[in-house]
From Swiss-Prot:
Subcellular localization, as worded in the UniProt entry: Mitochondrion
Protein name: Translation initiation factor IF-2, mitochondrial
Gene3D superfamilies tied to this protein: P-loop containing nucleotide triphosphate hydrolases, Translation factors, Translation initiation factor IF- 2, domain 3
Biological source species: Saccharomyces cerevisiae (strain ATCC 204508 / S288c)
InterPro entries registered for this protein in UniProt: EF-G-like_DII, IF2_II, IF2_N, P-loop_NTPase, Small_GTP-bd, T_Tr_GTP-bd_dom, TF_IF2_bacterial-like, TIF_IF2
GO BP field: mitochondrial translation; mitochondrial translational initiation; translational initiation
Annotated binding of GTP, by residue: 152-159, 200-203, 254-257
Gene encoding the protein: IFM1
Residue ranges of the region described as G2: 177-181
GO MF: GTP binding; GTPase activity; translation initiation factor activity; tRNA binding
PANTHER family named in the record: TRANSLATION INITIATION FACTOR IF-2, MITOCHONDRIAL, TRANSLATION INITIATION FACTOR IF-2-RELATED
SUPFAM superfamilies in the cross-refs: Initiation factor IF2/eIF5b, domain 3 (SSF52156), P-loop containing nucleoside triphosphate hydrolases (SSF52540), Translation proteins (SSF50447)
Region feature G1, mapped onto this chain: 152-159
Gene Ontology CC, one term: nucleus
Function field: One of the essential components for the initiation of protein synthesis. Protects formylmethionyl-tRNA from spontaneous hydrolysis and promotes its binding to the 30S ribosomal subunits. Also involved in the hydrolysis of GTP during the formation of the 70S ribosomal complex.
Length: 676
């Protein structure tokens, strides 16, 4: 880890070793300048001498990256001295071409007693937009609707619950009866009349990241558990994420209508509750505060109790947010896609403030001047307040699902901060390149110092770097959440011999750029939930394979089959005939004596150019393994000889070491089926 981050010298720091033993995360250590400096100033005597001197002015700008020899020129010192000092400070494999990052340069300048006007800030991709946010104003806090996430195992009835509450056919619109991406809806609860926003997170394991994201932006989690199946793998996974999120939880035991007998139903419900207790869920039965409600979304039984429980729990939680139009609006991207005749669209769940037409939003590497707001029924609305999910039109590019949305005053400010974020991305990218370059140079130096082993090392390195065969794919989906889920699903497929390699993953039908990239990288394009593709895409000139799917199981199955076909073949010998060597005789051909094996076929058929093994003795020791050169019957060349007939045989490679009593085994190399 230390080498990967380029902090070679950190591992010599005693304090760092103590912290590592305490299991403090490496990223925290890497950003701690105090820890770094402690190693640099460990030699107290020298440090005390330097501190007494007056700081020297810095007359040059600190670059993001600089080689050791160029830094020596800027410092006006001998490069040998700088390398010696760096080595003393713990750097390894330092050469004149070793590249230093800006952070290291700043520490070196401090060591050389230079005055630094501006040290690198701790701004990173996670907090680059934090200064755009406004502090919470308690006076503006008003009650808002709870955001409820329904989680659970696939086909345990999550979408059916929302279908009941919305009185619409959500289930019928989904391929295979399984929700394919997050939907966000605000409803008026049938009994209380209170507003509730639901996030319907998919139950398929492929959508793990989307479900995690749902848990992080919700207030209440409704965990659905089928009374027939009890806790399943994805149920346990949902429990884990719910615990980590710290959200309040309600358990809904579903499909009770399938068990009409009261005693049997009660027994099944009791089993589910006991299983929940084993998983550490503090249900009311043992004095906890987690409600367990048996329901049937199909018949409506106890659905009013579920709705009432959500409303009452939200009132106890006293959920509030700033609802003033003057408050800087914030939210989360729940879904994003490209719609025909509309363009880039993103569903935003409002966290605070109010979204209105004309406001400027920033998100990731894109921004938006709101052209229109559309509710979940497809109706344009004037504004969206906290806990409301709305489609926002007007994005320059498709934002990523899960990214935070922040309101800004102008497009100029949005562009300024996006540029700042892109610079950080570029620095991060360059940092990886620099680390790799330094490691390659260090390796080259080591190989140069060990010339006698250079060839062996090169061969070993080639074998190690060859790695598994990569099957390239480009993923195109209807929405970004599905694109991410498909990418995650197939990226994990494969083994040490063959693996999936996702070249790119994006939203919309395949473009000309996608086709060119597929041609260059020899990729197959996987389209998910895109409907009918244009004929010019399917019948593209480059002959790129384009496969279309509506259900993720089928996509994963096809990719797995392709990987299986690309596994290295394994063959086993299958004996198809046995032949006895009865005698040997010599035959003169063009002044050359050729020894021929006089044989009789015991079973099967021997063919010209057959693969054979000549074996000898009771243990059938192999004395020859190769092909037949000639096959004769009554002095005539023949293509094959069948059981019971005699023949004369010569072998390739000039093998003549056979003798009477030997046995010839005729075999075929049969490919053994392999599976991932």
């Amino acid at each position: 880890m230390l080498r990967r981050h380029g902090l070679f010298w950190l591992k010599t720091c005693p304090r760092l070793n103590v912290l590592l033993n305490q299991s403090i995360p490496i990223p925290h250590l890497l950003h701690s300048r105090d820890i770094c400096q402690q190693r640099w100033y460990a030699k107290g005597k020298r440090r005390n001498q330097i501190s007494k001197k007056e700081l020297k002015p810095l007359n040059f700008s600190i670059p993001n990256y600089i080689s050791v020899n160029k830094l020596a020129n800027l410092l006006n010192c001998r490069v040998e001295r700088l390398i010696k000092d760096l080595t003393a400070l713990g750097f390894e494999n330092i050469t004149t071409t070793y590249i230093l990052s800006k952070e290291y340069v700043e520490l070196i300048l401090q060591e050389y007693n230079f005055a630094l006007p501006n040290l690198s800030t701790s701004t990173n991709l996670d907090n680059v937009y934090d200064e755009l946010k406004s502090p919470v104003n308690p006076k503006l806090l008003t009650k808002r609707a709870p955001v409820v996430t329904i989680m659970g195992h696939v086909d345990h009835g999550k979408t059916t619950i929302i279908d009941y509450l919305r009185k619409s056919s959500v289930v019928a619109q989904e391929h295979g009866g399984i929700t394919q991406h997050i939907g966000a809806f605000q409803i008026t609860a049938p009994k209380s009349g209170k507003k509730i926003t639901f996030l319907d997170t998919p139950g398929h394991a492929a959508f793990l990241k989307m479900r995690e994201r749902g848990a992080n932006i919700t207030d209440i989690i409704v965990l659905v558990v089928s009374v027939e199946d009890s806790l399943m793998p994805q149920t346990l996974e949902a429990i884990k994420h719910a615990k980590n999120s710290g959200n309040e939880m309600i358990i809904a035991i579903t499909k009770i209508d399938r068990i009409p007998q009261p005693k049997e139903r009660e027994k099944k419900i009791e089993k589910v509750i006991n299983d929940l207790i084993v998983q550490g869920i503090p249900v009311e039965k043992i004095g906890g505060d987690v409600q367990v409600i048996p329901i049937s979304a199909k018949t409506g039984e106890n659905m009013d109790l579920l709705e009432e429980s959500i409303v009452l729990l939200s009132e106890v939680m006293d959920i509030r947010a700033e609802n003033s139009p003057k408050t800087i609006a914030e939210g989360w991207i729940i879904e994003s896609q490209v719609k025909k005749q509309v363009g880039n669209v993103a569903t935003v769940l409002v966290k605070k403030g109010t979204l209105q037409k004309g406001k400027i939003l920033i998100c990731g590497n894109t921004f938006c001047k709101i052209k229109n707001l559309i509710d979940d029924k497809g109706i344009p609305i004037l504004k969206a307040t906290p806990s409301y999910a709305t489609e926002v039109l007007g994005w320059k590019d498709v934002p990523h699902v899960g990214d935070e949305v922040i309101q800004v005053k102008s497009e100029a400010i949005a562009k300024k901060f996006i540029s700042k974020r892109q610079d950080l991305i570029e620095v991060q990218k360059n940092s990886s390149i620099v680390e790799k370059l330094n490691e390659e140079r260090a390796l080259a130096k080591e190989q140069h110092l060990n010339k006698e082993l250079e060839h062996e090392n090169t061969v070993q390195e080639h074998e190690q770097n060859t790695g598994p065969k990569l099957i390239n794919y480009i993923i195109k989906c209807d929405v970004s959440g599905s694109a991410e889920a498909v990418s995650e699903s197939i990226s994990s497929l494969g083994n040490d011999e063959v693996r999936c390699n996702v070249i790119s993953s994006s939203v919309g039908i395949p473009t000309e750029s996608d086709l060119k990239m597929a041609q260059i990288t020899e990729s197959t394009i996987l389209c998910f939930n895109l409907g009918n593709l244009p004929s010019e895409v399917i019948n593209n000139r480059a002959g790129i394979k384009i496969k279309q799917y509506n259900v993720i199981y089928k996509l994963i199955e096809d990719v797995t089959e392709t990987l299986t076909e690309n596994l290295k073949p394994i063959f086993e010998k299958k004996i198809v005939s046995t032949v006895d060597v009865r005698e040997t005789f010599d035959f003169r051909l063009k002044k050359k004596i050729i020894r021929i094996a006089g044989c009789k076929v015991n079973n099967g058929v021997i063919k010209k150019n057959s693969l054979v093994q000549v074996v000898r003795g009771p243990n059938e020791d192999v004395i020859f393994d190769g092909k037949i050169s000639t096959l004769k019957h009554n002095k005539d060349d023949v293509a094959e000889v069948s059981k019971g007939h005699e023949c004369g045989i010569t072998f390739e490679s000039g093998f003549e070491g056979f003798k009477p009593g030997d046995k010839i085994l005729v075999y075929e190399n049969v490919r053994v089926p392999r599976y991932l």
